[in-house]
Design a protein with these regions (language model features):
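Accessory interaction regions appended to the cores of large information-processing enzymes
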Residues: 1-132
Length: 132
């Protein structure tokens, strides 16, 4: 499994994952959501809360300009994380990391800092992602 990690304090965000890209996808699958026209996500293990699923969908929407063949489905085969080392926002960046690495593209940097007062990681660029 691949791994996404952010560590800027005594704790971090860590998500292990396996994702498969299915090109010319046939849209008759359970646990599948259309996140934008002709772009789908399928959860093999339906283990995401609504907030995490939202950030995953936003991560997928953020890369649609780079998709060359439609329809496409991103099948989330496995996801593993410890709730002590997790924030839902991590799903956005985990997907982007996977996509860019899978397509031999440079992974964009992540603007993040740890806020000691709220005991959370803050992702300033995700404030503008609400519209996606």
């Amino acid at each position: 499994m691949d791994k996404f990690i952010i560590l800027k304090s005594s704790w971090g965000i860590a998500i292990s994952y396996e994702i498969i890209e299915i090109i010319n996808h046939n849209q008759n699958v359970e646990n599948e959501n259309e996140v934008s026209p002709s772009v789908f996500v399928e959860l093999k293990e339906n283990s995401l809360d609504n907030s995490s699923l939202e950030y995953l969908a936003k991560g997928i929407k953020s890369i649609t300009q780079f998709i060359k063949i439609f329809p496409v489905c991103f099948s989330i085969e496995k996801l593993e994380y410890n709730v002590c080392d997790y924030q839902p926002e991590g799903m956005y960046y985990m997907f982007r990391k996977w996509f860019f690495e899978s397509h031999n593209m440079e992974v964009p940097p992540i603007n993040v800092y740890y806020d000691k007062e709220t005991n959370k990681y803050v992702f300033p660029e995700l404030i503008d992602v609400e519209e996606l």
